Amino acid sequence: MSQTMSKNNREAKEKKGQPEPLSGSHKVKNRNHSRQKHHAHHDM
């Protein structure tokens, strides 16, 4: 599922070329969320 989303995002970015900051922001947010969840679990 993640691979498909990444491919779609990449295609959209290459096609539009403008939604670069949007894609970056989304990626960072997603990564941050995953990291935070992991950290919380570790903390527990």
From Swiss-Prot:
It is found in: Spore core. It holds the Pfam family SspP. Residues 1-44 are annotated as: Disordered. Its main location: other. The keyword Hydrolase does not apply. Keywords: Sporulation. Induction: Expressed only in the forespore compartment of sporulating cells. One of its GO terms (biological process) is sporulation resulting in formation of a cellular spore. HAMAP family: SspP. Belongs to the SspP family. This is Small, acid-soluble spore protein P. The lineage of its organism: Bacteria, Bacillati, Bacillota, Bacilli, Bacillales.
